[in-house]
Amino acid sequence: MKRKDRIILKTAGAMLVLLLFFFAQGAIVVIAGIEGVPSALIRGAVIWGLVIITLAYSIIRYKGISKLGFRGMEKGAVKRVLYFVPLLLIALSPFVAGVDLKGGAAFLFANLFLTLGIGMAEEIFFRGIICGLWLERGVGKAMIISSVLFGFSHLLNIAGGAELGETVLQICFALVYGMVFALIFAESGSLLPCVLLHALHDFCSFVSGEASAQFEIFLGAVQFIVLLVYFLYLFRITARKREPAMKGR
C-alpha cells in the first residue's frame, strides 16, 4: 500500500472514531431529555473517555504522547504568533455580555469539564493526528484537509439540539479557526496552545451572559474579521519559513 493511501485510511479512521464519540455524547442527552449541569457532565464524560483511550493507546504504541503533539513549543514561537493575543481577545469577547452565574459553581465546573474535554479531543484528532499525518505533504495541504474536516464535523451539533442555521455559521467559523490552529501547530510544534485556546474559547462561549441577536451578529462579525486577519498573518510567517527549504531543494 502506498504511503498516501495509508495516510488517507488513517485520516478516515480517526474521523470515524471521533464522530462516533461526538455523536454519542450529543445523542445520549437529547434522547434522554437531559439538560443543564447533568447534560454537560455526561457529555464531558463521554468525550474524556475518548481522550483517555487515545492517550493510553499512544503511550502503549509510541511510549509517550509526543506523537500526538504534546511537547514543548519551539523557541521564539510564542513571540512569532503574537503571544496568541488575537485568539485571547476573541475567546474573552463574549464576556462583554456578562457571565452567567445563575447555575453557580456547579454550572461553571460542569462546563469547564466539558470544554476541556472538547478542546483535548478535537485538537488531538484534528491537529495532532490528522494535521500531523498530512504535514509531510506540506503545511498548506495539512491545514486545508484538517480544517475542512474540522469545520464539517460541527454538523454533529445538530445531534445535540442545535439549529441548522446556527450550525452552518459554526461550520464557517470553525473552518477559519481550524486553519489558524493548524498554522499555530505547524509554527510552534506543540499541541498544548491549541488545546488550551480551544477550551478557553468554548468555555467563555458556554458561560457568557445572553445578549440580543443584533449584538451577537455584530460580535460574530468582529470576531471573524480579527480571526481572518490573524490567519493571514500566520500564513505569511509560515510561508516565509518554508521559502528557504523550498529553495534548498
Regions found by a protein language model. Give the residues of each.
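Juxtamembrane helix-loop-helix connectors linking adjacent transmembrane helices
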Residues: 30-44, 59-124, 131, 135-136, ...
